[in-house]
Swiss-Prot record:
The keyword Secreted does not apply. This is Lipid-A-disaccharide synthase. One of its GO terms (biological process) is lipid A biosynthetic process. SUPFAM superfamilies: UDP-Glycosyltransferase/glycogen phosphorylase. GO terms for molecular function: lipid-A-disaccharide synthase activity; phospholipid binding. The gene is lpxB. Condensation of UDP-2,3-diacylglucosamine and 2,3-diacylglucosamine-1-phosphate to form lipid A disaccharide, a precursor of lipid A, a phosphorylated glycolipid that anchors the lipopolysaccharide to the outer membrane of the cell. Belongs to the LpxB family.
Length: 385
């Protein structure tokens, strides 16, 4: 354990899921180093623990190649400013949390300045653009991976990697309480609910709000008594979703909640959601789900040439087989979504739930504590790779 009176950590989290991981890591580090200082880019959870944000986390919350290109000048300005600030700060360690296209370039520059670097959340190098492993090897002293199969990939390429598990698997109980969640959200205890989660970023709602709303109309025809509930990450995303609802299904009633996505999923009988970390959360809450995703045509055509796997949702990747339906790009239509939701709501869920339970146990490792121990061991290490 480091004997310094005050450790300084620079950290960059790019979106909501990174803020959750960052806050968990901060809390674990503060157990042994209560005076530690944390600086960089973080979200509200990290800031609640004393994190000093130099830029708003929203600056990095972009998706798809087209959107990134349009924001590139600003992203490059943020990164160059961070390089200058962090180099002057001389932290004991820099921790880039996810956001690999932003953070790995930042880590490369900082490591060249003699700063120890950690990348928390392995980029999907096993799924697409596998040659990124060579840049990661140059940019980081250590990768903290959330998924068990990732470590073998890094070991094969002799890149230091520690499997820490996933904080969501630690936080979410093995059995989620539907009745309590409904009581908290003031939902009918006896009705059938479908949770609709179109994503947390503006670009995701731009692509998914319309097909999800139109699918809900079709689902209502199949299941006349079903009700819909949608958590939106903030007021801006709520307004965006309301516009889609008004434009495409003005008479459809969807109960909207600000935040509380986990409670909404726990309260639901089934879930329709965008691909991403939320699919892992839905798996851990153990509800039937349909995963859908759509990006701009250009982004899709470019990404398609780089993909190494034929699955994209975390439950299917973890299971190594298709346990939940995936509808991507041209298959992400209201008709196909509604049909898939109908199948999932009517099928025997017991075998899928059993697989979700197995995967939950696999990921339950006290991730924040393991990550903190790995970071502190690196801080104490005399030799760098």
């Amino acid at each position: 354990m480091s004997k310094k009176s005050q450790l300084v950590f620079a950290m960059v989290a790019g979106e909501l899921s990174g803020d959750i991981l960052g806050a968990g890591l901060m809390a674990a580090l503060q157990k042994t180093h209560p005076n530690a200082r944390f600086v960089g880019i973080g979200g509200p959870r990290m800031e609640a623990l004393g994190f000093e944000s130099l830029f708003a986390m929203e600056e990095l919350a972009v998706m798809g190649i087209v959107e990134v290109l349009s924001r590139l000048p600003r992203l490059l300005h943020v990164r160059s400013s961070l390089i200058k600030s962090i180099t002057e700060l001389k932290p004991d360690c820099f921790i880039g949390i996810d956001a690999p296209d932003f953070n790995i370039g930042l880590e490369l520059k900082l490591k060249a300045q003699g700063i120890k670097t950690v990348h928390y959340v392995s980029p999907s190098v096993w799924a697409w653009r596998p040659k990124r492993i060579f840049k990661i090897a140059k940019a980081t002293n250590m990768v903290l991976s959330l998924l068990p199969f990732e470590k073998a990939f890094y070991d094969k390429h002799q890149v230091p990697c520690t499997f820490v598990g996933h904080t969501l698997a630690d936080d979410i109980p093995l059995e989620s309480d539907k009745a309590s969640a409904r009581q908290l959200l003031e939902l009918d205890p006896d009705a059938e609910y479908l949770a609709i989660l179109p994503g947390s970023r503006g670009g995701e709602l731009k692509q998914l709000a319309e097909p999800f709303v139109k699918a809900a109309l079709l689902i209502k025809q199949q299941f006349p008594d079903i009700r819909f509930v949608t958590p939106l990450v903030n007021q801006k995303r709520r307004e965006q979703f309301e516009q889609a609802l008004k434009a495409h299904a003005p008479d459809l009633e969807i109960h909207m909640v600000e935040g509380k996505s986990r409670e909404v999923m726990a309260a639901a009988d089934g879930i329709l959601l965008a691909s991403g970390t939320a699919t892992l959360e839905a798996m851990l809450i153990k509800r039937p789900m349909v995963v859908a995703y759509r990006v701009s045509p250009l982004t899709y055509e470019i990404a398609k040439t780089m993909m190494q796997v034929n699955r994209f949702s975390l439950p299917n990747l973890l299971a190594g087989r298709d346990v939940v339906p995936e509808l991507i790009q041209h298959d992400c239509t209201p008709e196909k979504i509604a049909a898939a939701v109908g199948v999932e709501l009517n099928r025997d869920f017991a075998p899928i739930k059993a697989e979700f339970e197995r995967l939950h146990q696999l990921l339950r490792c006290d991730a924040s504590q393991k990550a903190a121990e790995a970071v502190l061991a690196l801080v104490d290490a005399k030799e760098l790779n």
